[in-house]
Amino acid sequence: MKVTFKKDYLKDFVADSEVELLKPTAGFVRDTLLARTGVGNEMEDWLTLPSDYDKEEFARILKVADKIKSDSKVLVVIGIGGSYLGARAVIEFLKSEFHNEKANKEGLPEVYFVGTSASGRYIDDVIDLIGNRDFSINIISKSGTTTEPAIAFRTFKSLIEKKYGKEEASKRIFATTDAHKGALLNVAKENGYERFVVPDGIGGRYSVLSAVGLLPIAVAGINIQKLMDGAKAAQEEFAKDEDILNKPSILYAIYRNILYRKGFDVETIVGYEPQFRFLFEWWKQLMAESEGKDNKGIYPTSAIFSTDLHSIGQYIQDGKKILFETILDITKPISDRVVPSADDNTDNLDYILNKPMKEVNEAALTATAQAHTSAGVPNILLQLDDLDEFNLGNLIYFFEAAVAVSGYLDGINPFDQPGVEIYKTNMFKILGKPGYTD
């Protein structure tokens, strides 16, 4: 049960000899990562996180998740970037885009994410959705001063204190923040919020398997131990002393790098299930922040087919050949629905009568990959055995390891994100924050 890398649609674009040529460098890069001797090594604790995590904190996460499930109809998760994308990705990938609509039937709280933008309307909508129901808050921020989540926390902190009073509200607010410093840590201490740690040696985009992601994920009814087990299996596979071309994450990094050097500057990750959407949003942050620097890097985009075949599909087929696709497929059917019968055959669908929808979807996948590769668009195929916690944990670590290797192959530090700070500084100047002037 691991990610399978398939090169069926790559033979016209990458020769085996090209892969062999990069093999020694990729092996050196993998060893550099494991030895933690490369640039940015102070931010590589994600490498061993699936096996070396705080077991006491993990137990508290489970306990708090049970409390929230028992006393709240809604959990409001406040965070931006890596402080929310991982959790939302896991929840929607495993539960569906309609997890909140289905939550009450499953006896689970609805989970809403705020602080992801400066939209007042979005906050209004979430407050309307909560209504008079019981709710809790998980505020996730290393510093507590990032503008968008800080505004959201002010808003929902006031709301929850007005509803329950400060003492009871303090039992419903859970802070995931820096262990030693920061505005949010101070607020949490002053108010007696239960605290979880944003790890020092793990960047936000690599943090989904820490308390940053695990508390909201557990509240949504997902087995976080199985998620960690899947990631641990991927960790062990990545570190195992064997031919590195047997490692799917390294193969993925090598092929991406070769395609990039050939002028394919854009990677579109593609799925055929709508519930993949936010996993792809997490993937985009992981790839863009890790690789997009020093005027280098593959630009990551995403698409959900067949939907987007009827919009950007035209460009992929007939437009400028600047992109390659990475397809994510689940081999086991995730639904037993079949094409239904009808009183007549005016829609001419009887030729697929009673065929599983999975078979129709797979036909679309194969047909599209054939069409795009024939038009000069390389396609990488990644397969998971099943849509479950173990396989997703494995996939998360797969992507993290792959982009780390890919970044080093491209000669950049895949663990910093200096460009993100520039808009923040400009925004502070525009809004007149003390200490920020032209």
From Swiss-Prot:
Catalytic activity: alpha-D-glucose 6-phosphate = beta-D-fructose 6-phosphate
Keywords assigned by UniProt, alphabetized: Cytoplasm, Gluconeogenesis, Glycolysis, Isomerase
A GO term for molecular function: monosaccharide binding
Entry's Gene Ontology BP terms: gluconeogenesis; glucose 6-phosphate metabolic process; glycolytic process
Pathway info: Carbohydrate biosynthesis; gluconeogenesis; Carbohydrate degradation; glycolysis; D-glyceraldehyde 3-phosphate and glycerone phosphate from D-glucose: step 2/4
List of catalytic residues: E289, H310, K424
A UniProt-annotated Pfam family: PGI
Enzyme Commission number, as recorded: 5.3.1.9
Assigned protein family: Belongs to the GPI family.
Function: Catalyzes the reversible isomerization of glucose-6-phosphate to fructose-6-phosphate.
Protein name: Glucose-6-phosphate isomerase
